[in-house]
Amino acid sequence: MLEQLLHIDGQILLWIQEYLRFPALTSVMKDITNLENAGILWILITIVLLLDKKTRNVGYMSALALIGSLIVDNILLKNLVARTRPYEVVDGLKLLIEKQSDYSFPSGHTGSSFASAIVLWKELPKKYGVMALIVAVLIAYSRLYVGVHYPSDVLAGVVIGTVLALVSVWLVKKIQGQKKLVK
């Protein structure tokens, strides 16, 4: 069963390569995937949120979700699962960016993108939240497009990031509610 799922994962990547890669889109996808290197996009957004008193709690939520994503995705699961990158094992898959130095599962880019974007979607005016979700989806897709993740890596990143975002929102609201009761 697991072998079949792994095979399907690879076949989806080859299908994307065959039917959805276009020269004009490739440079855009490379730029989108690089947007999230080291989490920089979401970290910058979080810093901006923390600087404004009106959005500070949203900044706390995003920061907590991003830290959770770093720990769960990049420190724990990548090393625990130790899944080889698809470009190393899927015959015919062409890598469009430089080789990655860590393991494949789950997608850290996707996890951190959804961790922050879901917070923004839940807590900011919808136009900002929707923009954040669109960027997160584009980053997730770019990881497939450039050949560094399997679809299941990206799906796991979406799920983990979303759960961490929801827990972070709940936790910060709970802490803020307790602070108000103490005063």
Where are these regions (language model features)?
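Small-polar-interrupted transmembrane alpha-helices in polytopic inner-membrane proteins
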Residues: 64-78, 129-142
